Each structure stands twice: as C-alpha cells, then as structure tokens.
Amino acid sequence: MPKMKTHRGSAKRFKKTGSGKLKRSHAYTSHLFANKSTKQKRKLRKSAIVSAGDFKRIKQQLANIK
C-alpha cells in the first residue's frame, strides 16, 4: 500500500496549534477593501479555528503534518 500524501494546498492554508486544533485565515481579505467597514476588516485580521464539521476531512488531507 503506498504512503498517504499530504495535500499541499491544505498544508499551505492550515497550521496545527499546540492543542491539536487547526488554525485558518479568514476569507475576503485580498482586495475590495473600500467596500468593507473598518470593523469587518479588523475582525478578518485575526485567525480562526477550523469548525468541528470540517476538522475530520482536513485532518485527513494533512495526514503527515506534525
């Protein structure tokens, strides 16, 4: 049986925290900032934790990430 490969796109987008959760960045942060409020832009700066529903699938893609 061949080894499970890490999904490289996912490896660039997610980081594992010390407690084993997955950190991600927010969407809507690349352009068109004039249409967004200061409050919205400030909230988008912080990273977020992957939700429980997505965690299992993403964890499989990151099989070899420590």
Swiss-Prot record:
Coiled coil: none annotated. Residues 1-42 are annotated as: Disordered. Keywords: Ribonucleoprotein, Ribosomal protein. One of its GO terms (biological process) is translation. PROSITE patterns: RIBOSOMAL_L35 (PS00936). Residues 1-26 have a biased composition (Basic residues). It holds the Pfam family Ribosomal_L35p. One of its GO terms (cellular component) is cytosolic large ribosomal subunit. GO terms for molecular function: structural constituent of ribosome. InterPro entries: Ribosomal_bL35 (IPR001706), Ribosomal_bL35-like (IPR021137), Ribosomal_bL35_CS (IPR018265), Ribosomal_bL35_sf (IPR037229). Belongs to the bacterial ribosomal protein bL35 family. PANTHER family: 54S RIBOSOMAL PROTEIN BL35M (PTHR33343), LARGE RIBOSOMAL SUBUNIT PROTEIN BL35M (PTHR33343:SF1). HAMAP family: Ribosomal_bL35 (MF_00514). This is Large ribosomal subunit protein bL35. It comes from Bacillus pumilus (strain SAFR-032).
